[in-house]
């Protein structure tokens, strides 16, 4: 396949799959029903990381990370349909968290070692 899909196009693919005239299986899924899929795909991504270390098979890891992204997108789409939140909210939240927990990069904090970073991370997490 030569076409390169964007994040926006991928988001639309997920919407289409869950649309009334989309895929029956995808339409039936709920947060709860997708738990086994989320767990399986997360484990397969971990396996893909280990395989990359052993064999340098980047294609496998790329595919497995795509499967994890699919899970995130499916849960976000379901949440959007339920009026809870959107993928944009997920991205906003994680972006704010990364900026907040890295004051040594995005603020006035300092960190001279990984240990200092982890200490700051835990302190901020407690707030």
Describe the role of every protein-language-model region.
Residues 1-64, 70-127:
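Flexible "arm" and connector segments at domain edges
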